[in-house]
């Protein structure tokens, strides 16, 4: 993990209130090299659903993934818990215990996040897992009416 030298790490402008060192380092690298991180396996990964199903199978099934995820959660290993459960939820979106534990995991990660955007993504992800995605499936009638009145130019 990359860390700033202690001589500048605690300066207000260098704190992770918006961006984070880990993201900024990646952004600097990507500015020169694009999205690719240099790992060949990341060139053409499986789609999340297919990858999730294969991970769940490789780990030994849904019950085994849940067992390992609960152990990791109880040990405070929230990033590993999120990784395990993310695969399970993509493999089986209707698995309620996995969705609930993943929501709890995202909440813990959100509470610990110094970065505002990270906190927002974690807590919004937790809410979406338990309450659904806001506005999904609802037509916006104003937008439809507006688009009918726009010219193609």
Regions found by a protein language model. Name each.
Residues 1-152:
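Accessory terminal helices/loops
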């Amino acid at each position: 993990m990359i860390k700033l030298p202690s001589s500048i790490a605690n300066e207000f402008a260098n704190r992770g209130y918006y961006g984070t060192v880990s993201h900024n380092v990646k952004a600097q690298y990507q500015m020169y090299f694009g999205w690719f991180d240099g790992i060949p396996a990341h060139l053409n990964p499986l789609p999340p659903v297919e990858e999730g199903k294969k991970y769940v199978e490789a780990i030994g099934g849904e019950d085994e993934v849940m067992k390992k995820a609960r152990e990791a959660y109880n040990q405070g290993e929230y990033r590993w818990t999120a990784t395990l459960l993310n695969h399970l939820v993509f493999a089986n979106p209707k698995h309620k215990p996995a969705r609930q534990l993943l929501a709890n995991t995202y909440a813990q990660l959100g509470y610990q996040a110094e970065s505002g955007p990270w906190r927002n993504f974690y807590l919004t992800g937790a809410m979406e897992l338990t309450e659904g995605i806001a506005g999904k499936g609802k037509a916006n009638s104003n937008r439809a009416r507006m688009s009918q009145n726009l010219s193609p130019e």
